From Swiss-Prot:
PANTHER family: EXOPOLYGALACTURONASE X-1-RELATED, PTHR31736. GO terms for cellular component: extracellular region. It comes from Aspergillus fumigatus (strain ATCC MYA-4609 / CBS 101355 / FGSC A1100 / Af293) (Neosartorya fumigata). It catalyses: [(1->4)-alpha-D-galacturonosyl](n) + H2O = alpha-D-galacturonate + [(1->4)-alpha-D-galacturonosyl](n-1). The active site is at D245, H268. Its EC number is 3.2.1.67. The keyword Glycosyltransferase does not apply. This is Probable exopolygalacturonase X.
Length: 432
């Protein structure tokens, strides 16, 4: 049984992200291996015409040229961003009208660093102050080619250090897409999350290479690899992620999600949530399979994070608590960890440091039918002697949480778990 990438596997995966369309298939189901989507993905129709986007060069805005090519080749065509060319985007692009179209990105698309413009004009999505440079949506849309999208993030990292309330755009916004393939692509220096998948279904992300760190003392914060939100039947696979926040995060109303074959470094793990942030709103995450993950230098491996039933503040720009909903039928299977603080973390006290208050006002979200299987590796030692924590705010809101074949130890050889308000007989771990 394989738990992690070998060196050869990592090299092969990196090579698959080179500027080519090799591996792209219009039969999306054939691309999903070894596990298949929860529901068959619709095939993509052939394309019969090609449009090349003209680059103005010299940092001039190419947005009009991009939109012209998209309209011209919509409904059955392919739009090409040519190799060895840089396309500058200084205008928010609404591309939710797309239908039966491919975008082949061979060159580089770079977004301007005009922070005043983007704060005023980026697309606002409501949840957690999310904004995007563009909205890509419609029906049967494929984006591939191995080229680069560059968010010019450094100016945003420095600005956020001065003002935590600024609106930082997400690099890649998939909004309202019904049927699509994204990748291979390289994503670099996103101001905030790298990808938001909202109100979308039947989309596969395959061969995404994510990387981008700050060159100043100000960290690149909140740089999640993917955030799924109000989306169904999404596949994320065969990708390399070097970032500073969640490798993948399943935000509210994410259902039927498959994540497999990822190499995550420097992240906060693969996370359910956070959920329950908005009082009175119902958040559901259901039917999720996370399979064959390598997790390095992270705060968490597998993580479920839920806000308590009382108002809390994680940071100046992230506050909430009191929401409703459920987490159900989530499986993490085959995860290798190295230098990770918590191999497994389940918390219903996200954003609240006062544990007494958290227990007095337990979470309104239920967590049930959760499976952690076949973990191995070594933690960072930060939580010694503990390697994992499975803590519910009340025994009434957690049920059927299982852990089996967990072979994880701290650098000192300990393997303790914190287990609170859960059925310990279902946990094949050392509940200290």
């Amino acid at each position: 049984m394989k738990f992690s990438y070998s060196f050869v596997q990592v090299v092969t995966l990196l090579l698959s992200l080179s500027p080519s369309v090799e591996g792209f298939t219009r039969s999306r189901n054939d691309a999903c291996k070894p596990n298949h989507p929860f529901r068959p993905l619709p095939p993509s129709q052939p394309r019969t015409k090609t449009c090349h986007v003209v680059s103005n060069g010299h940092g001039k805005d190419d947005s009009k040229n991009i939109m012209k090519a998209l309209h011209k080749c919509n409904n059955g065509g392919k739009v090409v961003f040519d190799a060895n060319k840089v396309y500058t985007v200084g205008t928010a692009l609404d591309m939710t009208f797309l239908k039966h179209i491919d975008l082949e990105v061979l060159g580089k698309i770079q977004f301007t660093n005009d922070t005043d413009y983007w704060q005023a004009n980026s697309f606002k999505h409501g949840f957690q102050n999310a904004t995007t440079f563009f909205q890509l949506g419609g029906e049967d849309v494929n984006v591939y080619g191995g080229g680069t999208l560059d968010g010019n993030g450094q100016v945003w990292y420095d600005l956020y250090a001065e003002d935590a309330l600024i609106l930082r755009p997400i690099l890649f916004g998939v909004i309202g897409l019904k049927g699509g393939t994204i990748g291979p692509l390289k994503l670099r220096y996103s101001p905030q999350w790298y990808q938001l998948v909202a109100n979308s279904s039947d989309v596969i992300f395959d061969g995404i290479d994510i990387s981008g760190y700050s060159s100043s003392k100000n960290e690149a914060k909140n740089t999640d690899g993917w955030d799924t939100y109000r989306s169904d039947n999404i596949v994320i696979q065969n990708s390399v992620i070097n970032n500073g926040d969640d490798c993948v995060s399943f935000k509210p109303n994410s259902t039927n999600i498959l994540v497999q074959n990822l190499h995550c470094n420097g992240s906060h793990g693969i996370s359910v949530g956070s959920l329950g942030q908005y009082k009175g709103e119902v958040d559901i995450v259901q039917n999720v399979l996370v399979y064959n993950i390598s997790m390095y230098n992270a705060s968490d491996g597998a993580r479920i994070k839920v806000w308590p039933g009382v108002s809390s503040a994680m940071s100046e720009d992230l506050q909430g608590g009191g929401g409703l909903g459920s987490v159900k039928n989530v499986t993490y299977n085959q995860m290798y960890i190295e230098n990770v603080d918590w191999a497994i973390e389940v918390t219903q006290c996200y954003g609240q440091k006062n544990l007494t208050l958290c227990n007095e006002y337990p979470s309104n979200l239920t967590i049930s039918d959760i499976h952690f299987k076949n973990f191995r590796g070594t933690t960072s030692g930060k939580r010694d002697p503990n390697v994992g924590t499975i803590v519910c705010s009340s025994p009434n809101v957690c049920s059927d949480i299982y852990a089996e074949n967990i072979d994880v130890k701290s650098p000192k050889g300990t393997d303790n778990f914190v287990c609170t308000n859960v059925d310990k007989s279902l946990l094949d771990v050392n509940c200290a």
